[in-house]
Structures are given as structure tokens and as C-alpha cells.
Amino acid sequence: MSKLKRNMGLGYTKERREELLSETRLGILSIAREKKGPLSVPVWHRWDTETGELRFTSGINIRKGEALLAAGRASFTLLDDDSGYVMLEGPVTYDEEYDFELELVGTGMRYLPDSGEDYVRSTYMNEGKPWPGIVLWRIKAESWLTYDSKASRAS
């Protein structure tokens, strides 16, 4: 029996994966759940190159927040325009006190340049503060899986 040669492709460099994570792209957050499939939802995010953390704001008392608290870990996947991807995985923590302008309003403005600030302030804030239970979630990237389709085609 002959062995099949498998071409698993090439991964992104650290610089390219951080560049992709810093772009304004919708990513998919996946959280393992007991006796169920994973909860996978799209999220707006912000990549912090200094800390190596993926950051996003969301409710703590909603299905996503409850799943994050129960699992304590999550993964996040982002596609590039050429069928490549970057996936990170790691422990999840949250902060109730955070820089609202940067993390909540700033992220909204990244994704909706013309209306993001108004959208976030009218949907997630009251009198300049986030609604109770809107927290900053952080995933500390411990493991990576990436695929660079351009590099794989060239090799």
C-alpha cells in the first residue's frame, strides 16, 4: 500500500495573521458546549497586538456570555479574501470596567464608519455608559491554525 502525499498548505507568518486580525473583517467566535454542538456566532472584534488578545464586547447574561463563562475557552476564525484563514484559540476572560470609547464605540466605528458611533450609543449605551452586563471579552491566543492559499498554490 502506497502512502499518499498530503499537501497541508502553508500557514501565515505572524505578521500576516496579525495584519488580518487588525483589519475590519467579521469573524466567527466558536464556543464548545456540553452535550451540544459549538455555539458559533459572528462578532465585531479588535486585535490588540501588544497583548496578543482578541477583544470584543457583548453581554454576559446572554447565551454567548453564558457559554463563554461555562467553557472558559473559545476559538475565533477569520477568512481572508483568497480563501485562506486564521484561527486562534485560548482562554477567555472578561472585564466589567474598560475603555468604552475604544472598545465599544471605537469598534462600532471601525465596522460602520458612517453610522457606527450612533448605532453603538443608541443600541448598547444609556447616558454615556454601556447597558449593565455589556462586558469586554478577551481571548488570549495560545494556539493558532492558519492557511495561506496564495503561498500554498505557489509551492
Locate each region found by the language model.
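Amphipathic alpha-helical interface surfaces
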Residues: 17, 64-67, 100-104
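Short, intrinsically disordered, mixed-charge
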Residues: 69-74, 109, 113
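Short, basic/aromatic recognition patches
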Residues: 2-28
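Short beta-strand segments
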Residues: 24-60, 68, 74-78, 87-91
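Charged, gly/pro-rich active-site loop segments
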Residues: 1-12, 85-155
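Short, charged beta-turn/beta-strand-edge "cap" motif at the junction between a beta-strand
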Residues: 80-82
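A generic secondary-structure signal marking the coil-to-beta-strand transition
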Residues: 17, 25, 52, 84, ...
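Structural motif corresponding to alpha-helix initiation and N-cap regions
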Residues: 14, 61-62
